[in-house]
Amino acid sequence: MTIINWTDYFLEVAKTAAMRSNCLRSQVGAVIVSSDKMIKATGYNGTPSKVTSCYERNSCYRIENNIQSGTKYETCRSIHAEQNAIIQAGMDKCKDATMYIWGHNFICILCKRFIVQSGIKDIYLKKDENSDLVHGSADDLRDQLEND
């Protein structure tokens, strides 16, 4: 029997959360984990509650208008997985926690702000099964925000 390590375990949870996404363009999942390895919240990218999703509409404004990934976030009707998880957890459960993200290997400027403000300490990202694991810290994100 093989027991997977904590990082792989939490990335699998994030991967499962991504399967709830109702975004036609990308499926991203996030999980917030306390320092004692307890899951505090999960999130996935999708429309806010009671808003018709692009999946239900079978239409995505960003796809139809060839909007490049990483730009013009205000044109998207969805909430990012990271933001959704932070909202679900609340700041008290985010302090000194770790966030695991499945579905991309970068963090947009909007989510950098959320993560830094929430008190999350470390972040692990994995785009897909074949990509390398990316690790960063809130301090790294803070530095990026300072220098952008």
Describe these PLM feature segments.
Residues M1-D148:
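Zinc-dependent deaminase catalytic domain
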